[in-house]
Amino acid sequence: METTLQLYSNTPHPQAQYWSVCKVEALFETPFLELVHRAAIVHREHFNPQAVQLSTLMSIKTGGCPEDCGYCPQSARYRTGVQKQALLEVEDIVEKAKIAKSRGASRFCMGAAWRGPKPKDIGKITEIVKAVKDLGLETCGTFGLLEDGMAENLKEAGLDYYNHNIDTSPEHYKKVIGTRGFEDRLSTLGKVRKAGLKVCCGGIIGMNENRKERAGFIASLANLDPQPESVPINQLVKVDGTPLADAEELDWTEFVRTIAVARITMPKSYVRLSAGRQGMSEEMQAMCFMAGANSIFYGDKLLVTGNAEEDRDQLLMAKLDLEPETAENRRVSVQPER
């Protein structure tokens, strides 16, 4: 039985279509090179294929999270060596944001390890958002479940994007997370949309899900109304001490397939090649860009896990003739050969 998600309205988005799990699964079954080719054509119809949006992600409150997400080293339930830290001071965050901008990042993402902010936290968070926004950067926050009115506070402070991943398919979700439900995720996404914020929503591949469950994950994202402006696709980073430390290895072609299917089903969304790049070969990353990925996290750390080194990223982008996205090169008409 398929789960139908109708998140924001009772009428289909005029520029979207309903994607059944079966239909998405059929895309996954497409011969690999044909699937990548189809995704590349879709990508070129909506984006400049040479431009890659660079984001930097910083943990502004680390560790001690009460949730039991099976992939997360910041959970207080697991012994992973992550030390709990309080919410950082505004000045420290601004300094990191300045460095990120100087290195080419156009978006600065901030994450806090907790179930969700308390009303007493919102004042400081909005102060942080305003300070980063004043640097001329796009701002993105991943602060967990939001109470009523909080999304409006963040919007007023200048937050551009709110990240809140669904993580995996509705069917696989309970195998990964038990302390909050899939519907809790959707509730916060609804509050974010209602406040007028852009949505960044994706998940993690390689958490022992099967292909049908991966198809259910992509279908759930593609059927959000409207579709997320940004879709981060993470490859599981296995961390000792977490329940998923011994998850089965995912074949690299399956990850590339997921990128391609995300691009085809969400043609106007940024598809971000997110966590896990540190362990990816240059060839695998190149295939992901060919399949429609057009955003990466740039910097040596993602919250508390490692990321590809900046020098390595610069070298790879030069090899592939890619360039950081700017307002000028964001949309260039490239007619695909047919």
UniProtKB/Swiss-Prot annotation:
Keywords from the UniProt entry: 2Fe-2S, 4Fe-4S, Biotin biosynthesis, Iron, Iron-sulfur, Metal-binding, S-adenosyl-L-methionine, Transferase
GO terms (molecular function) for this protein are:
2 iron, 2 sulfur cluster binding; 4 iron, 4 sulfur cluster binding; biotin synthase activity; iron ion binding
A Pfam family (short name) is: BATS
Question: So, what pathway does this thing act in?
Answer: Cofactor biosynthesis; biotin biosynthesis; biotin from 7,8-diaminononanoate: step 2/2
What InterPro entries does its record include? Aldolase_TIM (IPR013785), BATS_dom (IPR010722), Biotin_synth/BioAB (IPR002684), Biotin_synthase (IPR024177), Elp3/MiaA/NifB-like_rSAM (IPR006638), rSAM (IPR007197)
Gene Ontology BP term (one):
biotin biosynthetic process
Query: Could you tell me what the cofactor note in this record states?
Result: Binds 1 [4Fe-4S] cluster. The cluster is coordinated with 3 cysteines and an exchangeable S-adenosyl-L-methionine. Binds 1 [2Fe-2S] cluster. The cluster is coordinated with 3 cysteines and 1 arginine.
User: Which residues hold [4Fe-4S] cluster?
Assistant: C65, C69, C72
Q: What is catalysed by this protein?
A: (4R,5S)-dethiobiotin + (sulfur carrier)-SH + 2 reduced [2Fe-2S]-[ferredoxin] + 2 S-adenosyl-L-methionine = (sulfur carrier)-H + biotin + 2 5'-deoxyadenosine + 2 L-methionine + 2 oxidized [2Fe-2S]-[ferredoxin]
For this protein, what is the EC number? 2.8.1.6
Cofactor(s) this protein cannot do without: [4Fe-4S] cluster; [2Fe-2S] cluster
Q: Which domain of life is it from?
A: Bacteria
Against CDD domains, the record matches this protein to: Radical_SAM (cd01335)
The record's top EC class is transferase
- Could you describe the subunit structure of this protein? Homodimer.
| NCBIfam families, per database record | bioB
Q: What does this protein do?
A: Catalyzes the conversion of dethiobiotin (DTB) to biotin by the insertion of a sulfur atom into dethiobiotin via a radical-based mechanism.
Q: Which family does it belong to?
A: Belongs to the radical SAM superfamily. Biotin synthase family.
Q: Which HAMAP family match?
A: BioB
PANTHER family the record matches: BIOTIN SYNTHASE, BIOTIN SYNTHASE, MITOCHONDRIAL
Record protein name field: Biotin synthase
What species is given as this protein's source? Actinobacillus succinogenes (strain ATCC 55618 / DSM 22257 / CCUG 43843 / 130Z)
Gene, per the UniProt record: bioB
